[in-house]
Design a protein with these regions (language model features):
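A short acidic, leucine-rich amphipathic alpha-helix
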Residues: 54-56
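Charged, amphipathic alpha-helical coiled-coil/dimerization segments
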Residues: 71-130
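C-terminal regulatory/oligomerization modules of transcriptional regulators
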Residues: 1, 120-145
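Short alpha-helical "packing" element that flanks the helix-turn-helix/winged-helix DNA-binding module
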Residues: 36-40
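N-terminal leader segment of winged-helix/HTH proteins
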Residues: 1-30, 76-78, 88
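Short capping segments at the starts of secondary-structure elements
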Residues: 46-51
Length: 145
């Protein structure tokens, strides 16, 4: 029988694995990882653009990872940006079109995987997930020692 730790870890890892497979399928033709799709969707909600630092904070990603991924998105013609870390990053027309596709597919995916839940179950699920996320964040800051 699985312990709660094993059950939790296994399920979270499996969800993450499948989500990345789904996201990667749409990004392969651009030679990009599925994880870069979050930057496109965040930027689509910021028509005036964001700095790499703001994008890092908004996506909960490491600044070095964001910088590397932005270079790839720029090479793919999906974003434009000025020089320097504080420069504004915006979507190109091609980036906007791809972001819209990603958002539509993500909405479909979330609807599909949560389609068997009632609205009450969905509300409870997200409430509990938010609390677990916050508790994990706090625990990672204070550590186990």
């Amino acid at each position: 029988m699985l312990s709660r730790f094993e059950h939790f870890t296994y399920d979270i890892n499996e969800i993450d694995l499948h989500w990345h497979r789904i996201a990667s399928a749409g990004m392969k033709r651009y030679g990009l990882r599925g994880g870069t799709s979050i930057y496109l969707t965040k930027l689509s909600a910021a028509p005036d653009g964001m700095s790499a630092s703001e994008l890092s904070a908004a996506c909960g990603r490491d600044k070095a990872d964001v910088s590397r991924d932005l270079r790839q998105l720029e090479r793919a013609g999906l974003i434009s940006r000025g020089k320097g870390y504080r420069a504004c990053v915006t979507l190109t027309e091609q980036g906007k079109a791809l972001a819209e596709q990603i958002i539509r597919k993500a909405e479909y995916a979330v609807g599909f995987v949560g389609g068997s839940l009632t609205e009450e179950e969905r509300e409870v699920f997200y409430s509990v997930l938010d609390r677990i996320t916050e508790n994990m964040r706090r625990l990672s800051e204070i550590g186990l020692d």
